[in-house]
Amino acid sequence: SESIGYAMDKAILYGKGSAARMPLGIVTRLAQTVAPSDYPANAPAWVDLHTSNILQIGGDGVTGAEFWAELMQATGATYTRYSRGNMFWAMNSKTYAALKSKLITFTATGDIVANLFGSLPIVTGDIDVLEFMPDGDIVGGYGDLYLWTQRAGMTIEQSREVQFIQDNTVFKGKARADGQPIIPGAFVAININNTEVTTVMDFAADTANDAQL
């Protein structure tokens, strides 16, 4: 079930959309430069967000207040009238450590502190550590504006026959779902190393739907 949960997180961020029989990921939508041919006629007007909501900030020489001011300005691209909910910020542990390093300071008593404990300071919003994300990339926004639909409940099955000789029990978990950001402008992808944001992510082969496999 944990593996399925990580797969869902990865699909929400980087899913390739209906053409690949997958949910449409936040970063994938932000990176679009033209409206897809199957874009729904009754959906809100398609907007090109690949420059306004995919951003590069920071770099080796940017620290302290200057860095946090840049981050605050970049996260402001998530402006929307459609949510008053909490924000989230997904990143890997190296990026989390880099953010923490930019907060290190000495107290009056000589103690070293870095006040970053699961929530992004100043910007606000919970931090979700996902190790499949590239170093330096942060993806986030208003999570309640991503529509996720379970097409079928999660099932977990087991079999002893498939590796009977090895005396192993094999477990198989599966779930079917769809989703897409309903207000894409409520999300942003940022790289804090002043390099390009990764917009394409590899997924394991789909043995259920690909006739070539």
Segments from the language model and where they lie:
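C-terminal structural cap/anchor segments
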Residues: 84-132
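Flexible, glycine/threonine-enriched loop-and-boundary segments that flank and lead into catalytic domains
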Residues: 67-72, 104-108, 152-154
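Hydrophobic, glycine-enriched assembly/anchoring segments
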Residues: 162-213
